[in-house]
């Protein structure tokens, strides 16, 4: 089967891009031919044999930037210009999607969050129109919904709110939904009467990941630290919902100069760098400048060089050097970094991010130290310290979690879910 994937950006480290890459791996292993249509191929070249670029589909295109600004951030009194803009550029994208479907002879479409979250209005409109026009079987991989983001996608214009309600999420009769947590499945059913398949984030538990080697043994030196330090790794982007301030406060509470916190992600998605500046101020206030490191310039998703000969480390390298991982998020659609830590056999300290963590992950029986509402208690810190300073206990916990992860969040699980979704989509069309 020729399967076409539509996505705003692919190749980076955000959850949508990472999970899409895994879907592609499994779908190819199932014998399907995969073609990708994207607005941006991030941190890697595009393969013209199977991949097609549509610049207007990028979240950072002038067209999308302008419409997001006028719809949600700096709306004008009269939305007519915005509506005309949306109609015009959605038609541009629609025509390119239709051409691509014909040229690649697409049998089934997968819309990667583009039909769920209105972060690119024109792309969502174009996909909606193409799916309805062609009647092609479609899977919408819904990572986030507008109502999960507070008032981020609430406009003062009724016309825009009505439009968002109509287009997102896509609800064509020839489409089926894949959601990433049980809360989303319940909400989709309650709001729209739409059933869905709950597909968790997964990892390939047969790959070598998070293993120490000659290259990543150099990592402490490249960060300016000693090899006998104890490293807590925060392997996420720097955005407010990641709760990184709790990890910084943990370092303060442990009160040990040998404990270092390494934050691997950048703050490119932090609007105005406001959250990043708050973290810097907190580090200064707690006098942790020698213990907390923003090391995003050292890391690339796959450890690729930046082109000038400097060493770049992969996320696997980061996990390999971690004593433990911090993951104090206040909200996640699922939790990619959690599964990565499990795969890397590293203990993890987590915030009970509601409404997802406990029902979809914690209830499986993983051994973690869990805090509530981002607040560290003396008991929490004591439990974390026991793991940090006891390598035997850390290994016991990590090995236990690895076996659970292999059972619930492996490529085998994803393959079963994709077989179900493809069957549902082809039956619905």
Name each model feature, range by range.
Residues 273-317, 365-367:
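Nucleotide-activated donor-binding/catalytic signature segment of Leloir-type glycosyltransferases, i.e.
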Residues 149, 155-214, 278:
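A short, active-site helix/loop in glycosyltransferases that binds the activated sugar's phosphate group
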Residues 330:
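Aromatic "clamp/platform" in nucleotide-sugar-dependent glycosyltransferases that forms part
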Residues 35-108, 300:
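A conserved catalytic-core segment of Leloir-type glycosyltransferases
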Residues 5, 226-242, 248-251, 261-264:
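Conserved donor-binding/catalytic core segment of Leloir-type glycosyltransferases
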Residues 372, 379, 389-422:
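A charged, aromatic-enriched C-terminal amphipathic alpha-helix characteristic of glycosyltransferases
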Residues 1-55, 136, 415, 429:
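N-terminal subdomain of nucleotide-sugar transferases
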